[in-house]
Structures are given as C-alpha cells and as structure tokens.
C-alpha cells in the first residue's frame, strides 16, 4: 500500500514502514474481545427479585453485587483477563467489598462478600438484602450459605436486563471508564494495587450526584432518604408508581458527624 500510494521509486522495508505507522499514530487499535462474566444456565437454585420497588433509607439495607473484567496485557498483541468482584451499599454508594481473581471461580466473589460482612459484625436485628444477577457464583452453595448464615435475604435478577441490577452495573462502568481509564496493566498485582487506590478515592473523595454531592463515606453517616442531584431510571420508575398509589413522601435524612450536611434534622414533608 505504501509503495503504491507514496513510495514511487523509493520503497522502504517492513521495519521502517512499521516505524512510520507508529510515529504518526496510524496503527489500528487491537479490539479486545469481551469475556462473558455471567453464566445463568447452571441449573443451581435461584431466588426471586425482591427489590423491585425498594429504595433503601439507611446503610446496610441493600447490597448489590456484580463481576466485571479487566484486561492484562502480556505483550503488544496478547492479553488475558482478571475479574473484579464488587459489593456496593445501595444507600451510601460505598464499595464495601471487593476482590480480584484470575478466574471466575466462586472463591473471589466470596472474598468480596467476607470483606463486606465485616461491616455488620456485632450488629443485631439486621434487615439486609443482597441483590445480584443469577450467575453461578452468586447461586453457588458456598455463597448462598454464607449469606443465610448472617441472616441476609437473597434477591436475584429475573431477566437478562441490565436495569435489573443497574446500580452494580453502573459502578463497573465508573471503575473501568473513569477511575481506571487509560491505565494499561501487565500483571494482576498492578491491577489489585490500582483498584485499591481507585476504591479509596471513590469512597472517600469523589462526591456523587446520587447522594446530594456527598462522598459515600459521608453518606454512611446518614439515615433517611438522601436528596439527589441525579435520580436513576429505576428510582424514577419506583417514585412514579408511589405517586400513582398516593404513598406519602419520606423524611429528609439525619446525618451525623462532619460533612456538608452534618447536623441536619429530619423534616416530614407536608
């Protein structure tokens, strides 16, 4: 192609041609195939979706979980994947459990769950729901038994619609396309270190429109429905249904400790 269109009587060799392509940014970017992280054809027992109309009003009422992949480059053209398991508190938007693994084995989601469970150690009267897709990891006996041993109710998506687990899907997107954007990893240890830093930033420094521009760490000090600068599709649908049924509005949050809204007292809307 180069010889035909540009070289005339001055052809170049392969290596020089590659150097020119690289110098001017003309190399075609290798398209990474996306692995499938959810296998819902496993035949294991699943659970119904019990959070369709539920909006949490305090921490540790609803946890949402999902798994996503991160690419590891072995050389310029060869890559493998590792897998990030996340658990998010749906009220605070805080990542409370995570694990990185080289495979999709249940071991790694269980590690993330065990990390999250430290948040409720010693607490009584837990009224907590764990929501996930119907993947084999979340339906496995090891994962299900661990939830049941801690008195946590289990909810799973009933279709393949991403909106059924939209909050967990959204944090996956934030992690990969914002917090880790532009990073190129060559080993799993580098991934683990970068994810740890990203999660600390996400939880403690990054304000969220969905929790009134608080950080998740600040939202964890609140009780009651937090005002939102942005409302998800799911929550809009729930609110529309509540309005149609004439369900009263909830109280504003009580937030404890330091933060932009510390000391706010609950006010019942007229």
Which residues are covered by each model-predicted region?
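Short helix-terminating capping/connector loops at secondary-structure junctions
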Residues: 10, 123-126
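An active-site-proximal beta-strand-loop segment
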Residues: 52, 56-96, 102
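Hydrophobic (often cysteine-bearing) scaffold residues that line and stabilize catalytic clefts
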Residues: 13, 47, 84, 105, ...
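RNase H-like two-metal-ion nuclease catalytic core shared by retroviral integrases
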Residues: 37-41, 132-134, 140-144, 154-176, ...
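C-terminal domain-tail junction helix/linker
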Residues: 148-152, 174-270
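Mobile genetic element proteins and their domesticated derivatives, centered on retroelements
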Residues: 1, 17, 21, 51, ...
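Basic, flexible linker segments flanking DNA-binding modules
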Residues: 1-59, 161, 215-226
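Active-site beta-loop-alpha junctions of metal-dependent nucleic acid enzymes
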Residues: 80, 98-123, 139
């Amino acid at each position: 192609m180069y010889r035909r269109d540009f070289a005339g009587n001055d052809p170049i060799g392969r290596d020089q041609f590659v150097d020119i392509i690289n110098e001017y940014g003309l190399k075609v970017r290798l398209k990474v195939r996306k692995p499938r992280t959810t296998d819902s054809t496993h035949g294991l027992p699943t659970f119904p979706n019990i959070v369709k109309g539920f909006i949490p009003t305090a921490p540790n009422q609803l946890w949402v979980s999902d798994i996503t992949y991160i690419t590891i480059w072995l050389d310029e053209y060869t890559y493998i994947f590792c897998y990030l398991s996340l658990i998010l508190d749906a009220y605070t938007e805080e990542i409370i459990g995570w694990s990185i693994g080289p495979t999709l084995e249940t071991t790694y989601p269980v590690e993330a769950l065990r990390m999250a469970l430290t948040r409720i150690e010693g607490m009584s009267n837990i009224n907590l729901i764990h929501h996930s897709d119907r993947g084999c990891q979340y339906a496995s006996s090891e994962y299900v038994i661990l939830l049941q041993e801690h008195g946590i109710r289990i909810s799973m998506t009933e279709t393949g619609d991403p909106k059924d687990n939209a909050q967990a899907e959204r944090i996956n997107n934030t992690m990969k396309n914002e917090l880790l954007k532009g990073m190129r990893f060559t080993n799993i240890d580098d991934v683990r270190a970068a994810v740890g830093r990203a999660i600390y930033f996400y939880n403690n420094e990054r304000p969220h429109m969905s929790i009134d521009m608080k950080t998740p760490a600040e939202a964890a000090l609140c009780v009651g429905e937090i005002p939102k600068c942005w409302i998800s599709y799911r929550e809009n649908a729930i609110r529309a249904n509540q309005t149609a049924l004439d369900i009263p509005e909830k109280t504003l949050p009580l937030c404890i400790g330091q933060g932009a809204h510390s000391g706010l007292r609950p006010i019942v809307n007229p």
